[in-house]
């Protein structure tokens, strides 16, 4: 009986901390852009105006798992906006974008939402730049809607099953047990470990100064966002098993960048296989770099965008 009382007290206290903490996080990190309604759910977008004299294609930046558009803004937004119109989106369920409860976790679902968002914004045949899970989304979009894409720059994208070794664990967290954890203990513990976790993602490069604050990384600790993230990662292995069979049909210019020390998405298990299967893919493996190439090797990513822009204009 005493044990039960302790458990209830801990969970109850965690629930109160989570409720208050989520509100404080949202108060500290306000939306950067505007909202577009897609099927009754608001999608948060930020637009950066490019050089009006340039004929460069627009660029759409897609963030990875457990993140939000602030990460891509911090790494590439202003840099690419010098030459391109840049659009950043919070993927459904992340940042300040909403999604229907229990739905929208697969890259195919999110590609449909992205198509609607870009259509509303009048973004014509952009270059999609996606990091990690966002790279998978960009790849799916190009396979499903090739006529709507000028090209791809994929940064450490999961392309085949076996993602991070975490898909089964995240699928478990998407169950009612995960719901209870997300609404009670995940935020208090996550607030302690989010900086060390971010540091691990950047290895072997150092974590940029004030990264957690400047990227609004704490937004992922809100219960709904945690559940969305667990569902997204949990479904990825099964989704990629089917999508991998389509890579030979990829029809747009594509550059893939990966670090040879990326432990989250190792090149041999993912990008190397994609490049072997898809004739339009150019693979660049950077020695000594890890998973967060868009920060650690931003110049190389920007160069890849310009190369894809040139290739797309020549076709």
Ranges and model annotations:
Residues 46-49, 53, 88-129:
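Active-site loop/oxyanion-hole signature of alpha/beta-hydrolase fold enzymes
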Residues 279-315:
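Catalytic active-site module of serine/aspartate enzymes centered on a nucleophile-bearing elbow/loop
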Residues 130, 134, 138:
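Gly/Ala-rich beta-loop-alpha elbow adjacent to hydrolase catalytic centers
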Residues 167, 186-249:
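Conserved alpha/beta-hydrolase catalytic His-Asp/Glu region
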Residues 1-58, 82-84, 123-124, 310-315:
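Alpha/beta-hydrolase fold catalytic core
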Residues 48-96:
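Conserved HGGG/HGGXW glycine-rich cap/lid loop of the alpha/beta-hydrolase fold
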Residues 255-289:
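Conserved loop-alpha-helix segment in the C-terminal half of the alpha/beta-hydrolase fold
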Residues 143, 152-183:
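Flexible "cap/lid" loop of the alpha/beta hydrolase fold
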């Amino acid at each position: 009986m005493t044990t039960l009382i302790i458990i209830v007290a801990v969970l109850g206290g965690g629930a109160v901390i989570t409720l208050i903490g989520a509100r404080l996080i949202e108060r500290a990190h306000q939306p950067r852009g505007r909202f577009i309604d897609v099927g009754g759910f608001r999608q948060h977008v930020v637009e950066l105006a490019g050089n009006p004299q340039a004929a460069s294609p627009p660029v759409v930046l897609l963030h990875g798992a457990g993140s939000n558009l602030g990460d891509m803004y911090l790494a590439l937004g202003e840099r690419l906006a010098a030459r391109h119109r840049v659009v950043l989106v919070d993927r459904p369920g992340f940042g300040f974008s909403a999604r229907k409860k229990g739905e929208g976790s697969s890259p195919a679902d999110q590609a449909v939402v992205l198509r609607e968002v870009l259509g509303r914004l009048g973004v014509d045949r952009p270059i999609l730049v996606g990091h990690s899970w966002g790279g998978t989304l960009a790849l799916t979009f190009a396979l499903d809607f090739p006529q709507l894409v000028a090209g791809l720059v994929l940064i450490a994208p999961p392309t085949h099953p076996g993602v991070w070794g975490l898909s089964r664990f995240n699928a478990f967290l998407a169950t009612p047990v995960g719901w209870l954890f997300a609404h009670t203990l995940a935020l208090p513990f996550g607030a302690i470990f989010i900086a060390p976790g971010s540091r691990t993602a950047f290895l072997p490069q150092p974590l940029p100064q004030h990264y957690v604050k400047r990227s609004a990384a704490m937004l992922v600790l809100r219960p709904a966002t945690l559940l969305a993230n667990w569902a997204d990662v949990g479904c990825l292995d099964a989704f990629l098993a089917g999508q991998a069979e389509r890579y030979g049909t990829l029809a747009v210019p594509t550059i893939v960048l990966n670090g040879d020390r990326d432990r989250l998405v190792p090149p041999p298990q993912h990008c190397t296989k994609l490049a072997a299967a898809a004739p339009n893919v150019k693979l660049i493996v950077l020695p000594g770099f890890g998973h967060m190439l868009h920060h650690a090797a931003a110049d190389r990513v920007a160069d890849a965008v310009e190369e894809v822009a040139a290739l797309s204009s020549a076709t």
